[in-house]
Regions:
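Exported/periplasmic ABC-transporter solute-binding proteins
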Residues: 1-7, 12-160
Length: 160
């Protein structure tokens, strides 16, 4: 979005919703992990690779909280982390709240303290050369207001 604003393609961007990292454990939580404090004792903890967005955010949280964690595996995408946890191959992993929501009963969710400081932002803006800027603005208004319950149902945090 920053590039679109810089080159004049979009104006007045706004955050519509955010997506926060959560910890997931397999259904039934066989390793009995209750918090991120339990992770140093797990030999099967997975994260995304630091070079992809989910891994970058995870690294920021780890650095911010000064956590002493050592993932047994670093995956290229959130779906791989989620798959390892849901299948029981991993004791725990960090994924976006939307992915945890989509997994349903296959996983259990544990909040990561401080994760809300490091989110993915879902942005919206009217393009500078929109053919129908008023209608485009109306869509953004719906997405930032009336759509809040739908954002929540899907695991996002809507902006208030």
């Amino acid at each position: 979005m920053d590039k679109a604003v810089q080159d004049g393609t979009a104006t007045a961007p706004e955050v519509l919703a955010t997506n926060v990292m959560v910890m997931v454990v397999p259904k039934g939580n066989p390793a009995e992990i209750q918090s991120v404090g339990d992770l140093p004792h797990s030999d099967h903890f997975v994260l995304c690779d630091p070079h992809v967005p989910c891994g970058d955010i995870s690294s920021q949280i780890i650095d911010d909280k000064r956590l002493d964690v050592h993932p047994s595996s670093q995956e290229r995408q959130v779906a791989d982390v989620l798959g390892k946890v849901a299948s029981g191959e991993a004791d725990a992993g960090w994924v976006y709240s939307t992915d945890a929501t989509a997994a349903g009963d296959d996983v259990e969710v544990i909040d990561i303290p401080g994760a809300e400081k490091f989110t993915n932002q879902i942005m919206g803006a009217v393009t500078a050369e929109a053919s129908h800027p008023d209608q485009a603005r109306a869509v953004l208004d719906i997405l930032s207001g009336d759509f809040a319950s739908t954002w929540r149902e899907r695991g996002f945090t809507p902006t208030e």
